[in-house]
């Protein structure tokens, strides 16, 4: 059910986020994530911070990749061209040709498969898998908070996060040119449940010292 899939684009990502991520040892990738655990199935699509040492961090340019983490095989990465003009056109053309071949041979092949399978026992329905709500998923987060440039603002931000039991793991706050009216406070948090982060961001956004939209980028799971 794709209607239940959480999807977030990249429009909120700025060049400064890429630079801050690099300083923190990460790269920003737009990921589709599926995790099956005892709690159920997590499915989501959003920008994520990937450690520079991770396999996915090396996927660049027109390359796309699928990383699979399993108990038996550990981490495996499958990559190939699939983004950009020529690479996308090639992939689409391959799909069209494959579909055309399937349609052309469908009648004979379908009849043959029906004869082969009619005596086979039918498989039962797949077991239901519970879906983990986005609000219940825990992630470490990168927060870029635009604030007025005056003393005491960071203490306000830290207090608001602490009120929601969110720990600060790293901070970047750079001096801005005198002509700039605002300054960005960049914070890396511990792993926190999504609903808690949302509540904290709502409180932060209500502060009169926060002067713009807060950017939040989740850290990709490292199973």
Predicted regions and their residues:
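Substrate-binding/catalytic subdomain of NAD(P)-dependent oxidoreductase enzymes
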Residues: 1-58, 63-65
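Conserved active-site and cofactor/substrate-binding residues in soluble primary-metabolism enzymes
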Residues: 5, 9-16, 60-63, 83, ...
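Glycine-rich phosphate/pyrophosphate-binding beta-alpha loops
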Residues: 52, 75-86
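Short gly/pro-enriched beta-turn/loop segments at secondary-structure junctions
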Residues: 61-63, 71-73, 136-140
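An anion-binding loop in the catalytic cleft
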Residues: 68-79, 93
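Short acidic, glycine/serine/threonine-rich loops at helix termini
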Residues: 80, 90, 104
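A conserved regulatory-domain signal marking ACT and ACT-like small-molecule sensing domains
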Residues: 96-223
């Amino acid at each position: 059910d794709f209607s239940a899939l959480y999807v977030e684009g990249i429009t909120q990502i700025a060049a400064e986020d890429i630079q801050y991520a690099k300083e923190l040892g990460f790269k920003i990738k737009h990921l589709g994530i599926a995790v099956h655990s005892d709690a159920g199935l997590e499915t989501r699509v959003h920008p994520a911070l990937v450690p520079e040492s991770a396999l996915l961090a090396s996927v660049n340019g027109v390359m796309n990749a699928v990383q699979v983490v399993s108990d038996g095989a550990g981490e495996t990465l499958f990559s190939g061209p699939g983004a950009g003009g020529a690479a996308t056109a090639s992939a689409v053309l391959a799909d069209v040709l494959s579909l055309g071949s399937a349609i052309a041979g469908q009648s004979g092949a379908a009849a043959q498969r029906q004869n082969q399978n009619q005596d086979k026992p039918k498989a039962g329905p797949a077991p239901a898998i519970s879906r983990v709500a986005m609000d219940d998923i825990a992630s470490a987060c990168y927060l870029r908070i635009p604030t007025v440039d005056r003393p005491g603002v960071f203490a306000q931000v830290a207090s608001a996060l602490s009120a929601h039991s969110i720990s600060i793991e790293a901070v970047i706050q750079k001096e801005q040119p005198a002509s700039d009216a605002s300054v960005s406070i960049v914070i890396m948090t511990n792993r926190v449940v999504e609903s808690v982060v949302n509540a904290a961001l709502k409180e932060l956004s209500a502060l009169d010292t926060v002067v713009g939209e807060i950017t939040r980028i989740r850290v990709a799971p490292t199973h």
